[in-house]
From Swiss-Prot:
Pfam families: Sigma70_r2 (PF04542), Sigma70_r4_2 (PF08281). The keyword Kinase does not apply. GO terms for biological process: DNA-templated transcription initiation; positive regulation of DNA-templated transcription; regulation of DNA-templated transcription; response to water; response to xenobiotic stimulus. Signal peptide: none annotated. GO terms for molecular function: DNA binding; sigma factor activity. Was identified as a high-confidence drug target. Residues 156-175 bind DNA. Disruption phenotype: No effect on growth in culture, or in isolated macrophages; infected guinea pigs have a partially attenuated lung infection. The sigma-70 factor domain-2 mediates sequence-specific interaction with the -10 element in promoter DNA, and plays an important role in melting the double-stranded DNA and the formation of the transcription bubble. The sigma-70 factor domain-2 mediates interaction with the RNA polymerase subunits RpoB and RpoC. Belongs to the sigma-70 factor family. ECF subfamily. The gene is sigM. It comes from Mycobacterium tuberculosis (strain ATCC 25618 / H37Rv). This is ECF RNA polymerase sigma factor SigM.
Length: 196
């Protein structure tokens, strides 16, 4: 059934402002079938990047993101509005990635091919691959913390809420992850300071 005449998924009936994340989530819960799609599209790029950084392969990232969005779609009614909707979505994505990593660890498989792409000739691509490999060598909990804080820009407090741990735990996980990354990537010697 097409939407009613005069209805725009982005603004509802004749409104001139873009709906906030909280308004979109509330509209979804109230039955607006376009609201969740708009919310997902708004955050897709950042959520996919987070999933890719937290997963072993791009396929795992895609699957985890799909799992996360299905969970968010189904569980939207339980959102308490005590945090930003984007933080809630990020927490769901991180949890979906961690769940997949735990399942893979419990049921290891031998890869049929190298999971990392062949580096092309640019130093930027080589560095990105080296960083990705180093991230994959971190324990899952450390990786999730350092990706959220150092790569996604979340505060310690927001990361603690997303991961469901104490702020001190996030700080120690980040410190351990940074120290290990410095050892693993020290050969790059790019002169870039690791954020502390």
């Amino acid at each position: 059934m097409p939407p009613p005449i005069g209805y725009c998924p982005a603004v509802g009936f004749g409104g001139r402002h873009e709906r906030s994340d909280a308004e979109l989530l509330a509209a979804h819960v109230a039955g607006d079938r376009y609201a969740f799609d708009q919310l997902f599209r708004r955050h897709h790029r950042q959520l996919h990047r987070l999933a890719r950084l937290t997963s072993r392969t791009s396929e795992d990232a895609d699957d985890a993101l799909q799992d996360a969005m299905l969970s968010a779609h189904r569980g939207a009614g339980s959102f308490r509005y005590d945090a930003a909707v984007s933080s809630w979505l990020h927490r769901i994505v991180v949890n979906a990635c961690l769940d997949r990593l735990r399942r893979a660890k419990a049921h290891p498989t031998a890869p049929l091919e190298d999971v990392y792409p062949v580096a092309d000739r640019t130093a930027q691509v080589e560095t990105a691959i080296a960083v990705q490999r180093a991230l994959m060598r971190l324990p899952v909990e450390q990786r999730a913390a350092v990706v959220a804080v150092d790569m996604q820009g979340y505060s310690i407090a927001d990361t603690a809420r997303m991961l469901g741990v104490a702020e001190g735990t996030v700080k120690s996980r980040c410190a351990r992850a940074r120290a290990r990354l410095a050892r693993l990537l020290g050969y790059l010697n790019t002169g870039v300071n690791i954020r502390r």
